Amino acid sequence: MIRVEHLYKSFDDRPVLVDVSLEIQDGETIAIIGRSGSGKSVLMKHLIGLLKPDRGRVLVDGVDINAVSYSELRRIRRQFGVLFQGGALFDSMNAFENVAFPLRTFTNLSEEDIRRRVQECLELVQLPDVGAKMPDELSGGMKKRVALARAIALKPRYIIYDEPTTGLDPETANAIDELICDLNHRLNVTGIVVTHDMHSVLSIADRVAFLYQGRMHWIGTLDELHRSDDPILLAFVKASEYQIGQPLSRTA
């Protein structure tokens, strides 16, 4: 379980996170939503210890990640897989080597075991035959899948998805949403989706956390989201629908 307790963070005296608290239960998929500049990415970086709060705590399985040694922080980080926005594949490595990278960096596995694990991960993301391809030979959706294979290579307990559908056409975005749902259930991981894509939220999330002007404005289930009359939350949802120009369900 992850607990965020009264988190504060400012940059150049500009508050970005203000008294943010959040509890993420094991096995759930939670979507962190909000406008650009609302603090979503900054909160995500705090979850894996890339940023330290000015005040407050982040606890992973009861451990304050900002009060441990660097070696212990590395151990905690190994429990997280991250699907970075855009995929962030290494251009100089083929798909196989991209997925193998964390295995070579953080484990002492033999080459045979690395080969087996990479192939297993590529099959899980439904790309069993792309190992030899370079990133520039892959479509946007395929890059996301390879990046997701890399994110699950170390068998994490938590996966952070940073804007997983940004830049994808609706059909490909739907496929990525379905893959995320499938992997979260098959691998029994906790999913944390940082997004402004309400289509993805409705497709994959169990709960939603809405950041507004650096504060945690609203937290609830999808059912509670549908029933909410919170004016700020509703304005965000309606703006998302308007910007996309179609009903919030991509399959509608």
What are these regions (language model features)?
Residues 48:
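Helix-to-loop junction immediately C-terminal to a conserved catalytic motif
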Residues 63-64, 111-129:
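Conserved ABC ATPase "signature" region
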Residues 134-138, 142:
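Conserved ABC ATPase signature
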Residues 153-157:
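A short, proline-enriched helix->beta-strand linker immediately N-terminal to the Walker B motif
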Residues 159-162:
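Catalytic Walker B motif of ABC-type/P-loop ATPase nucleotide-binding domains
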Residues 170-172:
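Helix N-cap at the start of a conserved alpha-helix in ABC-type nucleotide-binding domains
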